[in-house]
Amino acid sequence: MYKETILQNPVFEDFYKFLGSSDSQKIISDNGYVSTKDDTSSYVKENDFKGTINISGSTSLQPLMTLLAEKYETIQTNVDVIVSGGGSGTGYKNAENNVSDFGMISETFNSEKAPSCTSYEVAKDGIALIVNKVNSFDNITLEHLKNIYDCDINGEEKISTWGDLA
């Protein structure tokens, strides 16, 4: 996700174009993610740019974005792309508050979390849950999983065991 005004910067606009190129889509599909763009064309280097692009957010997308950044840096050798994690919440917050130029999220875009941002789907990822068969907790619901990952960030509620979810 990004603020549309950042595309007025030619470096950010060029990286945005690169993300939609067939070059990026090949990296995406070659690394186990689902490409979301059909009939894309190759990235064409129109200018030599110089600058820094900051991207932060989803840790599940971080490895992919790092690969995309590395490829872009081989083409635009005077551009540094800095990719950091922190989770989707960080992606929303940092893009909204101009800490990062682009935010990564691995969920459906929620405009209430970043009202001045626009969503741009680069790829889709999948997350699977595997539970040990000797775990006594069964019938795990989406709400249980949500409680694990949405526990109070201030530490007021700590989920340490499956029993804490019941």
Indicate where each model-derived feature is located.
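Flexible loop/hinge segments at secondary-structure junctions
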Residues: 1-166
